[in-house]
């Protein structure tokens, strides 16, 4: 089941039950002809021993209590509905959508991880990737389609289809193709970015721009992308600081547009910031989150790949 690994990582007890997620009716069919394929981690001693043993026992008990206190900080009190990504921020919801949030539909958590600045091992934010409940059917339709499976995925006949898909999703070139084809169907996705330390809107905006420009196809689409990035910069209508544990939401809509929103945890209110209409911006951004040669967050990419395979 898709959420089992997620909830195990969030310390769900063996008694907790995970409710089933119903796949809703299909939105639109997947057409194989639209598939795109790229080109060619004595007693005195006994007394002394007894005292030593008692001391060690006492030390062990104290140490155990300290570890128990540390572990309590990571316990998720609502493990059926949330996932603990980082003990320093609020748990990520497993399901998210309206009316609390101004999204177009309901979403379920597909994978999560964190973003590090590698050269100084500096954690910047935690990242959650969600998929629209109504669009889950597109995952097996695309990744298990006869044409794509035969021509591109199931190349190792000694492995099962799931094993081949897993290998492809963890391959720098194949993952970009598979995720690209999934996004091209209009599959709605949502990214939740939660800073683990105080930052500001400019830093978040600049980070998104750099991520998009790092996409392998960015240079080949520079002119179109430039206008889209201008839209993205203008979408950040809110200025100033973004406190730790607030959220930036990026919703990839069915038509490829990207809706930017901000959740102020202190006020418990979500603000729509702006809309990016150029489809390449959202596609390149989510491609970088979910695959490609240099995924922005390797932990998130592996988590997404694992749960996509579980959906097949």
UniProtKB/Swiss-Prot annotation:
Its main location: mitochondrion. GO terms for molecular function: intramolecular lyase activity. GO terms for cellular component: mitochondrion. It is found in: Mitochondrion. Gene3D superfamilies: 3.50.70.10. Keywords: Mitochondrion, Transit peptide. Residues 1-48 form a transit peptide. It comes from the Eukaryota. It holds the Pfam family Chalcone_2. Belongs to the AIM18/AIM46 family. This is Altered inheritance of mitochondria protein 18, mitochondrial. It comes from Zygosaccharomyces rouxii (strain ATCC 2623 / CBS 732 / NBRC 1130 / NCYC 568 / NRRL Y-229). The gene is AIM18.
